[in-house]
């Protein structure tokens, strides 16, 4: 990330990419993170360790370990005390995706305010209904236009 920001600052100095660096490291307080699935897990992991401007999670995190009884248990890092205040966290997932229960549990463990969470409920668009995918509702929050207002909500509030 540092190398990318340095490169962008050299190539486009008028864009002030260097403002996202501080003492040669990411200036996390000026950086917003967002991701889908594994990308959301990475965004959450970073936001737990650094105070960021905002973090938006789609359909994740659902990192887990299996207990002796073969039960999925959230990874410890998810419920660990974090650096980013809860009011800067946003998340959304579809109620019919395979890991919906674990995602809901993760959002609670991360202390995301309930009014910052969107649970998507609409059916798949007709073109996606016969795809044969094992988890067809995973990703609806980022690609289905019916949720444009929810995505705008996630982006629209300043901390």
Language model features: what each stretch is:
Residues 32-39, 43:
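Gly/Ala-rich beta-loop-alpha elbow adjacent to hydrolase catalytic centers
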Residues 22-25, 77-83, 158-159:
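Surface-exposed acidic, glycine-flexible loop patches that form ligand/cofactor-binding
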Residues 45-54:
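Conserved hydrolase catalytic core segment
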